[in-house]
From Swiss-Prot:
There is a cross-link at residue 63 (Isoglutamyl lysine isopeptide (Glu-Lys) (interchain with K-? in acceptor proteins)). GO terms for biological process: modification-dependent protein catabolic process; proteasomal protein catabolic process; protein pupylation. Residues 1-35 are annotated as: Disordered. Belongs to the prokaryotic ubiquitin-like protein family. The lineage of its organism: Bacteria, Bacillati, Actinomycetota, Actinomycetes, Mycobacteriales. Pfam families: Pup. This is Prokaryotic ubiquitin-like protein Pup. It comes from Corynebacterium aurimucosum (strain ATCC 700975 / DSM 44827 / CIP 107346 / CN-1). Pathway: Protein degradation; proteasomal Pup-dependent pathway. Keywords: Isopeptide bond, Ubl conjugation pathway. GO terms for molecular function: proteasome binding; protein tag activity. Protein modifier that is covalently attached to lysine residues of substrate proteins, thereby targeting them for proteasomal degradation. The tagging system is termed pupylation. The N-terminal unstructured half of Pup provides a signal required to initiate unfolding and degradation by the proteasome but is not needed for pupylation, while the C-terminal helical half of Pup interacts with ARC to target proteins to the proteasome. InterPro entries: Ubiquitin-like_Pup (IPR008515).
Length: 63
C-alpha cells in the first residue's frame, strides 16, 4: 500500500439550492505512504517481539 495517496473532499453550501451564493468546497490531500511504512515497521516489531514492544510504551511508577 506504499505510495498511495488519499483524497478527502468536503462539500460547501447549504444544500437548499435557489439563489443563495455557493461556497467552494475545501479539499485536503493526505499522503499515506509514511503512515503505511510506520505501520509496517510496527507489525514487524510485534511479530518478532510483542512483549518488548508493549513494555517500551508502558509508563513506569504510575506516571
Amino acid at each position: 500500500m506504499s505510495g498511495q495517496q488519499s483524497q478527502i473532499n468536503a462539500g460547501g453550501g447549504n444544500g437548499q439550492g435557489g439563489d443563495t451564493p455557493e461556497f467552494d468546497a475545501g479539499q485536503v490531500s493526505i499522503n499515506s505512504a509514511g503512515t503505511d511504512d510506520l505501520l509496517d515497521e510496527i507489525d514487524g516489531l510485534l511479530e518478532s517481539n510483542a512483549e518488548e514492544f508493549v513494555r517500551s510504551y508502558v509508563q513506569k511508577g504510575g506516571e
